[in-house]
Amino acid sequence: MKKIYLLINSLELERGGLTKANLQQASMFSELGYETYILTFNYNSDYNGIIEDIYDVYKVNKKVKIINMYDYFRNEDQIDQKFKSYKNLINDDSIVEKNDSKDIVKIYENGLYKKNISYRSDESIKKIDYFNNSNYRIKVEFYAPEGYIGKLSYMDYNLNRPRQMTFYNSIGNCYLRKTVNPENGLATKVDLIKKGQIVHSFRSDRQLKSYFVEQIVNNNKDSVIISDARNTDDIMINIKNENSSKNVRLHSNHLSPNGEIAKTVMTSLENLKNIDSLIVLTSQQKEDIVNNYGYSEKVKVIPHGIQTLPSKDINNIIRKNKAVVISRLVKLKQIDHIIKAMQLIKDDDPDFILEIYGNGNELENLKSLVKKNKLENNIIFKGYTNNPLEIYNESLFSITTSKSEGFSLSILESMASGTPVISYDFKYGPEEIIDNNKNGLVINLSLIHI
């Protein structure tokens, strides 16, 4: 049976289109009968709980196997629960400063700041930062939910960044050690350890990650490897397995807003000769890449797909007097343009509502802009949603104002719900998805007033 391995650096619950697409294609491959794996590479002590929720929330086929690199090298099937409450670490004579909004307590001993304890909602310890008498952070302990220390970081006093990291199993044995350059965060030496002995050494994290994939794939002749994230492209390219098909799947525009090739995709584009295929989302993107790099036979077009709601008579859906935006709240998405446009809509229809779903580092700036324009009664921030189709289903229209995309899942989801889309004419997607003036509008970039 052909085995498929999807590479993505990390998985979290509240993620955007790339994660959705990764999980969806994994389920599809599994349902078609392929043995399917998702391989992740980041350290997260809460991964087991996150993965359980991901299967449930994203409806991932249970046959899909999700394997994390650190869990693989830790090599433990079952762990005894050793629950530790952060309260057990507080001495009677300690001074405690609590920050309820961040689930953090600061511990002072004899007047000196000694510890910073982060904890989970069940009061289990998540992380402890230790400080010396000169207030330098000296080390950080990362606790698994089961109560053991899974990772230790020893800090550079001046830069306040790790110099050395050690990773432990549930009985306290070190299975991995890293020496890190604190100036750039890159590992300069990585040791795999078994029974107290170094069994493999690497000069970088990338070498470790490629080795991890090689161990999983195990030179299988019928294996297909797909790199779904740009920070896994070089991992896949450097895998020493001639029998595997190596494929890169782009989920975004390969061009920067200034029209130059984005640095994040340079690895894959410059290694077209070393991979079997580059999968893009639109015919226009393929044409642009082939014109610059050639290899037409290797560049394939496979658009995103979505799971639709049960069939309904779109004409009989009762829609509310509102528009909707579902997006990461980052500068690239230009949500501020929509907020400015809402001022114009409000003048014509004071009761019209805009709902904005999503999270991101622009959230507070966008809230401030809403307040500045006195739009608090017309624009509502709703947070992250796992039910985009239902939300689109009750809206008059949706709006997309990105500078660029690889292929906008939000446009596809909106149209699947029978909800028209107003979208900027960015590369790539709107022109190929929207039938202008029939099921939506494609307008010039940055045209706030239509």
For the regions a language model picked out, list residue spans one by one:
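Conserved small/polar residues in nucleotide/adenosyl-binding loops
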Residues: 448-450
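Short hydrophobic beta-strand element within catalytic cores of glycosyltransferases
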Residues: 420-423
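Conserved donor-binding/catalytic core segment of Leloir-type glycosyltransferases
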Residues: 314-333, 339-342
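A short alpha->beta transition loop at the rim of the catalytic pocket in nucleotide-sugar-dependent
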Residues: 389, 396, 418
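Aromatic "clamp/platform" in nucleotide-sugar-dependent glycosyltransferases that forms part
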Residues: 384, 403
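Donor nucleotide-sugar binding/catalytic pocket of nucleotide-sugar-dependent glycosyltransferases
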Residues: 247-249, 255-258, 273-291, 295-310
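Short acidic/histidine- and often glycine-rich active-site loop of Leloir-type glycosyltransferases
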Residues: 426-427, 431-437, 441-442
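Short glycine/serine-rich donor-binding loops of glycosyltransferases
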Residues: 408-411, 430
